[in-house]
UniProtKB/Swiss-Prot annotation:
Record keywords, A-Z: Flavoprotein, FMN, Oxidoreductase, Pyridoxine biosynthesis
Higher taxonomy: Bacteria, Pseudomonadati, Pseudomonadota, Betaproteobacteria, Burkholderiales
Any one Gene Ontology BP term: pyridoxine biosynthetic process
Cofactor binding note of this UniProt entry: Binds 1 FMN per subunit.
Role noted for this protein: Catalyzes the oxidation of either pyridoxine 5'-phosphate (PNP) or pyridoxamine 5'-phosphate (PMP) into pyridoxal 5'-phosphate (PLP).
GO molecular function annotation: FMN binding; pyridoxamine phosphate oxidase activity
Protein's name in the database: Pyridoxine/pyridoxamine 5'-phosphate oxidase
Length: 214
């Protein structure tokens, strides 16, 4: 019988060299993300978001990236959820993209800020109607009696707002403003390639690149 200790893959699809990467980590991320799209990976926009609560307890969950530019990485959620409470207490977070089919991961760390109300409104209006209703119906992370309770809340919201629910005040966007971004490429014998971009100053547009030991 196969045991957990016996499960392993020898990575050999590609390499990652300083001479081949973009000087800007956002350009490098864009390059890798486009390659993930071209490879038709299932939901390459999924990422793990790690936060820390007021009690020091870490928490992680999968969320969807909804925007990337030179300012940072944007996602949307309920501000009153566990992640929202964590980020209110400690506005620092880490993101992880894992594209196993390409034997790649990207680790991103930095400070968190809320997006503007206009940016949140614009994205909320683009969501499917069911998702907009769900943002009102779900008290995310709260204990509920049953599935029937959730469905009753959904019906009540639908009857109240019809086809045009506004954005809830407790729902909107966050932007992770990175100070470090690591690109990881799997290599044979666990001697992986790891290139770390670090911002030269808090608001600097320039970055330094270092190679990390695997």
């Amino acid at each position: 019988m196969t045991t957990l200790a016996d499960l392993r893959i020898n990575y050999s699809r590609a390499s990652l060299d300083e001479a081949d990467v973009a000087h800007d980590p956002f350009a490098q991320f864009d390059r890798w993300f486009k390659e993930a799209l071209a490879a038709k990976l299932p939901e390459p926009n999924t990422m793990t978001l790690a936060t820390v609560g007021d009690d020091g307890r870490p928490s992680a969950r999968i969320v969807l990236i909804k925007g990337v530019d030179e300012r940072g990485f944007v996602f949307f959620t309920n501000y009153e959820s566990r992640k929202g409470r964590d980020l209110a207490a400690h506005p620092q977070a880490a993101l992880l993209f894992y594209w196993i089919e390409l034997e790649r991961q990207v680790r991103i760390e930095g400070r968190i800020e809320k997006t503007s109300a206009e940016e949140s409104d614009r994205y909320f209006a683009s969501r499917p109607l069911g998702s907009r209703i769900g943002a009102w119906a779900s008290e995310q992370s709260a204990v509920i009696d049953s599935r029937a309770t959730l469905e009753a809340q959904e019906q009540a919201v639908s009857e109240r707002y019809g086809d045009n629910p506004p954005r809830p005040p407790h729902w909107g966007g966050y932007r992770l403003v990175p100070d470090s971004i690591e690109f990881w490429q799997g290599r044979p014998s666990r001697l992986h390639d790891r290139l770390l971009y670090t911002r030269d100053a808090d608001t600097s547009p320039s970055w330094s690149i270092s190679r990390l030991s695997p």
